[in-house]
């Protein structure tokens, strides 16, 4: 009885393919980012920015809190001001608009409900990008706090989707990560 199928030995396999791996492009700065945050409760024109940064050095990015989640459908409260962005640019600063999920007291936003909906995530992405383009921001800084475990995977999906749009439009995307705690 023959227990071998034939000649045993190495076989050369040609894996020829016309597949070209896509190049992952990202926005990367060749310098250290020194960012400050500026909390707003109403639209600001930039006059305080000059005064607030007087005497500082090395700062190259300012992230004003200008977008707030306002509902579970992906709408935002927008208190951005073009004069603020222009003032920051005149000072040689990049401006990364901060979007917050906790600072709008009148909003009743459920992270799981918002982030688990493809339609709501898409609406949120579109609203953020439209506002960034309208006011001339250089980037978006996502500062979502107290995202519970049940919304974790949906949050990551939102960041993935927003990152694709930002990358395609040349908009910087940064994410503030907090140390997870029991709450």
Segments from the language model and where they lie:
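Chitinase-like catalytic core of GlcNAc-active glycosidases
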Residues: 28-43, 68-183
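Non-catalytic propeptide/linker segments at domain boundaries
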Residues: 1-36, 46-55
């Amino acid at each position: 009885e023959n227990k071998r199928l034939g000649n045993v030995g190495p076989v050369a396999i040609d894996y020829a393919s016309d597949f070209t791996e896509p190049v992952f492009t990202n926005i990367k700065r060749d310098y250290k980012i020194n960012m400050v945050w500026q909390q707003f409760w109403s639209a600001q024109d930039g006059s305080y920015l000059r005064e607030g940064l007087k005497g500082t050095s090395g700062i190259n990015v300012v992230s004003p809190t200008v977008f707030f989640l306002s509902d579970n459908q992906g709408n935002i409260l927008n208190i951005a001001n073009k004069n603020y962005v222009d003032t920051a640019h005149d000072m040689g600063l990049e401006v990364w608009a901060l979007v917050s999920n906790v600072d709008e007291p009148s909003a009743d936003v459920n992270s799981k409900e918002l982030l688990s909906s493809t339609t709501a995530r898409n609406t949120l992405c579109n609203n953020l990008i439209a506002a960034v383009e309208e006011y001339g921001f250089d980037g978006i800084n996502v500062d979502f706090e107290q995202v519970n475990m049940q919304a974790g995977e949906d949050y990551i999906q939102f960041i993935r989707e927003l990152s694709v749009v930002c990358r395609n439009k040349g908009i910087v995307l940064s994410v503030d990560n907090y140390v997870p705690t029991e709450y």
